[in-house]
Amino acid sequence: MRNTSKEVQSTSYRYAPCDWYYHLPVKRSEKPVGAPPASQIPGLSDLRDSPSVNLPRARRYWIKETDSEYVKLAKQGGRPDLLKHFAPGTRQGSPVAYSLPDWYIHHSKPPTSLQREVPAVSIPEYMVYEEFNPDQANGSYESRQGPFDFDRKTIWQREAEELENVKRKVKLPAINSKNSSKAGTPVNNKDSDKSRLSLPPMPGPKTGSPTNFSKLISNGYKDEWLQQQKADSDRRTPKTSEASVSTQSTEDSKSKSSQDTETPQNSETPEGSEKTPDAEAPPSEATPEELK
């Protein structure tokens, strides 16, 4: 029974509809249909009018008192007829072509085929092999040079020029020092200050022998310096001894002069003063008798 029912269904619905493959044209309804807003943006047009039935109840309070003038104008749809598209109306009269501007064409009338100049056909210069003849060329002709053919000298000419440049000696002017120019004039304080600020003279050739590194490593220069210092000290010592001898001689001469001045004073002393040592002598002679 089940199989028979399936066979009947298969025969009745053998060809399935192809609604998914193509869209059938919808029949035009004669009922009035609400047109969409002119701006094609929902919520921006026809807000000044009373809200329709389709609008939600919240749209009644769409515009608030706290909104600025710009926001109120935007919520009401902006300026009137700002986003509306008007279809072009019917033309009155035949269409007229645009007039061509003066800067676009060279002549008021287009030139005919006879008036047109035939363009001169010329082959590029790099495709023509023709030797240059200066007699035939005009005075304004300038020979073209490639980017690498500026130097047209041979190797021998270039080497000769390099040797000549090496042989040439540059003569510098003589250096005149400021001190030599001012030798005859008296030196002032200002001149001395300027001379102090002047640059040092150029170093001349060294007269001394070059340094010997073996002698430098073995402290030979140190020994020479010590010997030189010792010789200088030996030269200074005799001068100091002579100075000490001269001071001693001056002191001896002063002492002798003081003794000479004291001797005449002793000669002028009275006779009583001369006998005093004799009076004092007897007690000295009596001392040994008492001791006996």
Swiss-Prot record:
Phosphorylated upon DNA damage. It comes from the Eukaryota. Residues 29-50, 166-292 are annotated as: Disordered. Residues 176-189, 208-217, 240-250, 260-270 have a biased composition (Polar residues). InterPro entries: DUF5524. The modification Phosphoserine is found at residue 50. The keyword Transmembrane does not apply. PANTHER family: CHROMOSOME 7 OPEN READING FRAME 57, SI:DKEY-276J7.1. This is Uncharacterized protein C7orf57 homolog.
